[in-house]
Amino acid sequence: MLTTTARRASAAGLALAAALTTTPALATATSTAASTSTATATAKSSAGTGLDRYYNQRPGWGSCAKGPDDAMGRDLDKAGVQCADVLVPLDYADPRGRTITVAISRLKATDTRHRIGSILLNNGGPGGPAVQSPPDVRKMMKKTGPRYDIIGFDPRFVGRSTPLDCGWPVGTDIRSAGLSRASFERQVAFKKGLADKCRATSGSVLPHVSTRNTARDMDVIRGALGERKISYLGYSYGSYLGTVYTQMFPGKYDRFVLDGAIAPADYGPRLLKGSERENEQALSAWAAWAAKRHATYGLGSTRAAVLDTLDRIVAASARGPLTVGKGAGTFQLDDTQVPFLFIAGNSDDTPETRASFAEQVSVLAKAAKGQPTELSPEFAAALKSALTGGSPNSGVQAAIICGDKPAPRDPETYWKDIQRSRAEHPIMGPVANNISTCAFLDTPREQPTQVRRDAKMLIVAATGDPRTTYRSSLDLHKQLPSSKLLTLKGANRHALYGLYGNDCVDNKVNTYLATGKLPKKDETCVKQAD
């Protein structure tokens, strides 16, 4: 799922994409005796599984900087963060076989007298790193932050962990199916090509890329930290990871916050399918905003006129790629790429995001008329990242999703869904229903996780979330009767706590993290005026 903002990426996690307690808080003392007792309990929990050496390891905490050019590492060092690698098996069915490392970071509790325990972070994606996140999360937690060891980790094959390189020449495989059958056929070839590259470069590890294995890694991290239980803050996809952990390791979790949550049934290779209505509604709301600023952006003086502008841009890109930028910063955008930009750019309803998106659409509108355009540094960087910015991590998101659930294999299945979706959702339908890269990768080794155990947790959701829909958060809440739902009414936003600036949401989450007590009933906050 798409994370939403650059701030999201640094603070708690595109992906645009939080946590639960079943028992009172962990003992606050950090004495040697307490640590030894916890380590002994951890060792017993892993006894006989062949995993003892992983659970019994102790991180070698040290500097986060990996060299003179590691700016992020230096910033973490300055913030008092320590970093380490945790050893985990590549294949949990063969714990004596090949090993990989998972990078972790720690901002230690400073209020040791009232220490609660360790809280792990996941920023969504899937494939989002979190080693960089503890300083920002400490600020978000306000007075509660100093009571936790805040633990960031880069999931297996992400960021500073043992990498997985799919050899992709692009930053993401998310595209629209376009306006024609020919465009769709190009997408079929594009996705098959990406799958073939990933299999050729990383085929030996692909069977071990999955959320269930990441959850197993989380439990090893818990053991390595010497904790009986862990707390957790997970955004977007991180909510799915958190849910999976509670199902696989009951009794090992404390305070879990799942923000921008998704029900397990809605997660998988077609994870945007079902969000068409919310994304089109978000576009419509933005169009009404832009219409009031026609003098600034020139996109139309009514909501309908602005939406017509979007349709004309897509139609023009179908006739021939739009040229945006100049010189070395020139990009060609066709009808499979432009709709994706409409969805990715309209990530929330803050004035800053709406203005930035309006500026981007203005550029595309000029290009659709054949006029020269100039890109802002931010838009140019976003285009480069998505369209040409291949990196070792580019294929990790797809690899994880494909390792979690099987996808339909027949391209006709997707084409029929695309055609059915066009009338009601002309922009989002062909994006949400487009063929998945997973259609060309092997079937996952394990069955998808089912919610069979109740779990106490706080689920946070906005009614207009365009990524993981409010309906999906409600479904997860219903599957976990002991959970409580914190709703933000009136917001078109994915991921809220500490990121959206809603005091009501932030204070209620922090109260839960501080006390370990869920509210007696579901609670509702209201969007603050801009």
Residue ranges of predicted features:
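Conserved alpha/beta-hydrolase "acid-adjacent" motif
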Residues: P466-R471
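Catalytic histidine-centered segment of alpha/beta-hydrolase-like enzymes
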Residues: N492-D503
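Catalytic-loop region of hydrolases
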Residues: L2-A15, A27-R181, A304-L307, T437-T443, ...
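Active-site-proximal cap/loop segments of hydrolase catalytic domains
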Residues: P163, P169-A224
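Conserved strand-to-loop "acid loop" that flanks and positions the catalytic carboxylate
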Residues: I459-G464
